[in-house]
Each structure stands twice: as C-alpha cells, then as structure tokens.
Amino acid sequence: MATNISKMFVGALHKIAAQPWVYDLIQRAAGQRKCIELVRKTVATLPAQTVVDVGGGTGNFREVWPANCRYVCLDLEMPKLLSFRAKVPDGLAVLSDASRMSLASGSADVVTCIAVTHHLSGALLDRVMDEAFRVLRAGGRIVLFDPVVNRERWIGQMLWRLDRGAYPRTAEELREKLERRFRVTHWERFAVYHEYALGIGTKLASD
C-alpha cells in the first residue's frame, strides 16, 4: 500500500515537472546555466548552419549556437514546443519521434541530444543514433550531453530517484552507444549536482 502511494506521489510530481514553466525552473535550479556555458565553450568552433536539437523541449540550449543558424527543435511534447516558439520565434518547432525524424538525409551540420538519453531504452537509443547519423551530412557532428550514474555522488543518487528518466547509464555505457555509430572526437565528464558526460561524435565521409 505504501509503495503504491509513493509511486502515485512521484507520478504526480512528474506530471507537474513536465509543465514548461516548472520544467524551466527546475533546470535553472539544477545548475543549467553552468551546463549551457560548458556546452557553448565546447561547440564554439563547430560548423553549425543547421542544428537539430533532439528532445529540445523549450529550447533552453538554443543560445549556444550562432544566432543566424537554422535551428530545429524536435520534441514529443506540444506544450514544450509552444513554449519554445514563444522564446525562439525564428526557430522551427517539429513534433516528431526522434527515432523517425521527418528530416531529409544529410540535411544537418549538428544534431544535439541533451538530457535525453536517460529517457530512452537501449534499443530506442540505438534507433535515435541511427536517425541522427542519417540526417547528418558527411563530417557532421552529434553532441551528446546527459547526466550519468556515479554511485559515489550521493546528491546525484538522490536526484536520480526524482528523475522521470527510467534508463540512467554510466559514462562508459553512454560512450559505447556513441561509438557504435560515430567516431568520438571529444569526451569529458564534470559535475554540478549530477555528474555529466559531454561527448561529440563525427560522421566520417567514408561511413
């Protein structure tokens, strides 16, 4: 009985957290500003005329890319896309499944997957990686950024218990998923409250 009540309570919290304004507030409280600045510094030299943000939500990471790039925010939650459109009127909001993107092959310079992979099963993540590979041009990059499991960080363990994602991974497991399709050209780990992994993979011209 107590377990069922606990599950219902967590489920109710997840529904509240999915509301765009609550989602943005939680991200800010969880140290998103530091994450944005780190990603901005890491991707500063990447060619980025067309950027596809997989699971882009409300578009909080739009600012790390050039103002004149073509920015596509792809998500499954319409309320978040509407919030994105309000914040980024010149961006393109696409309601779509990331494992079946309605985008042309070779049409993107960069595909980003930020704070998304822990919501995806292993098989689904493989399909998303395959789709990212398809829509990237030769030489294009995928930017993968996500919290990872570190059992030595007690605050991270606590945050995982509250997270909506059902598939947390270690940094090593996440890198293996990236290496399945891409050549890893950048990999680092850092901590805010969670521990994070930030990786860049390149689609080689010969692939």
Predicted regions and their residues:
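C-terminal lobe and adjacent flexible extensions of AdoMet/dcAdoMet transferase-like proteins
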Residues: 200-207
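Short catalytic micro-motifs in class I SAM-dependent methyltransferases
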Residues: 115-119
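A short glycine-rich, Lys/Arg-flanked "PGG" loop and its adjoining helix->strand segment in the class I
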Residues: 126-138
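Class I SAM-dependent methyltransferase SAM/SAH-binding core
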Residues: 52, 57-100
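C-terminal alpha-helical "lid/dimerization" subdomain adjacent to the S-adenosyl-L-methionine
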Residues: 143-197
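Class I SAM-dependent methyltransferase Rossmann-like catalytic core
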Residues: 7-34
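A conserved beta-strand element that flanks and buttresses the S-adenosyl-L-methionine
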Residues: 112
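Conserved alpha-helix/loop element of class I SAM-dependent methyltransferases that forms part
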Residues: 29-47, 60
